[in-house]
């Protein structure tokens, strides 16, 4: 028996909105530690890892460790039927080929339940090694989203460079070029508005903006984003989910010579 009750139901809606355009089908894994997902996009250039810790749920029951295959667009459609203030409960019996979403209004005067068929999805769980990164940038998530959106109106790729001067986002296209520099700024009144740069050595990498713009759909989940860069590793774009966990996006850099994305090469 699986039963997960989330008082802040809007959080699950936001999670699905941030995933559904990147990944079509995925397995949600349930264990004593939490509700998680790991999946690659169809081109094997981007990977997403999600964790919602068990203690963040009002009620969390997971008798076995089921893996539930779901179509994320279908799941998002069901969750759109929930009000933003609704309490969302996920239920599945052991061995069942369906999952039930129950939505309760805060005043308990309306209860809806939607049943969705599960899928059999073959997916390898990839081992993502812990790594030391050359540079880590923490900045307001809305600012990062704005930069990616603005640059994508000029070019298709962005060069992210971190030096002692700050972090620079650059692009070029048919109509011209654009450069945006963000310097370290820790003196702001609100910590959420700070930009913090930790650099062990300078780094400069090129990425496809269409993927970064997809990642920024997670902006409503967190006020801040952490971007971890290293010359021989995929970039990690992480949004912390308050008191619950995180959503991390991994993106392979483009190879300068032929301007093609590398495939992610984590071990299954």
From Swiss-Prot:
Organism annotation: Catharanthus roseus
Gene Ontology biological process terms, A to Z: leading strand elongation; mismatch repair; regulation of DNA replication; translesion synthesis
Function: This protein is an auxiliary protein of DNA polymerase delta and is involved in the control of eukaryotic DNA replication by increasing the polymerase's processibility during elongation of the leading strand.
Protein name, entry field: Proliferating cell nuclear antigen
Record-linked Pfam families: PCNA_C, PCNA_N
Intracellular or extracellular location(s): Nucleus
Protein family: Belongs to the PCNA family.
CDD domains, per database record: PCNA (cd00577)
Keyword annotations: DNA replication, DNA-binding, Nucleus
Presence of the UniProt keyword DNA-binding in the record: yes
DNA-binding region extent: 61-80
GO cellular component: PCNA complex
Main location: nucleus
Matching InterPro entries: DNA_clamp_sf (IPR046938), Pr_cel_nuc_antig (IPR000730), Pr_cel_nuc_antig_C (IPR022649), Pr_cel_nuc_antig_CS (IPR022659), Pr_cel_nuc_antig_N (IPR022648)
Keyword presence, DNA-binding: yes
GO molecular function: DNA binding; DNA polymerase processivity factor activity
């Amino acid at each position: 028996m699986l039963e997960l009750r989330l008082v802040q139901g809007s959080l699950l809606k936001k999670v699905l909105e941030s995933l559904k355009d990147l990944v079509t089908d995925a397995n949600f894994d349930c264990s004593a530690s939490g509700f998680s997902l790991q999946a690659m996009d169809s081109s094997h250039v981007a990977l997403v890892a999600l964790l919602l810790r068990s203690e963040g749920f009002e009620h969390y029951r997971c008798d076995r460790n089921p893996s539930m295959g779901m179509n994320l667009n279908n799941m998002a459609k069901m969750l759109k039927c929930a009000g933003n203030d609704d309490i969302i409960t996920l239920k599945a019996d052991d061995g069942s080929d369906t999952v039930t979403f129950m939505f309760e209004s805060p005043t308990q005067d309306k209860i809806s339940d939607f049943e969705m068929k599960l899928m059999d999805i073959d997916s390898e769980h990839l081992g993502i090694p812990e790594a030391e990164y050359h540079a880590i940038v923490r900045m307001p998530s809305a600012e990062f989203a704005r930069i990616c959106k603005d640059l994508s109106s000029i070019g298709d790729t962005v060069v992210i460079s971190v030096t002692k001067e700050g972090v620079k986002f650059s692009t070029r296209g048919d109509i011209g070029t654009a450069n945006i520099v963000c310097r370290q700024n820790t003196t702001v009144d609100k910590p959420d508005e700070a930009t913090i740069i930790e650099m062990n050595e300078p780094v400069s990498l090129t990425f496809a903006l269409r993927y970064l713009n997809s990642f920024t759909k997670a902006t409503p989940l967190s006020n801040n984003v952490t971007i971890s860069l290293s010359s021989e590793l995929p970039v990690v774009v992480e949004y912390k989910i308050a008191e619950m966990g995180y959503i991390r996006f991994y993106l392979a850099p483009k190879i300068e010579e032929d301007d093609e994305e590398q495939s992610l090469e984590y071990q299954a």
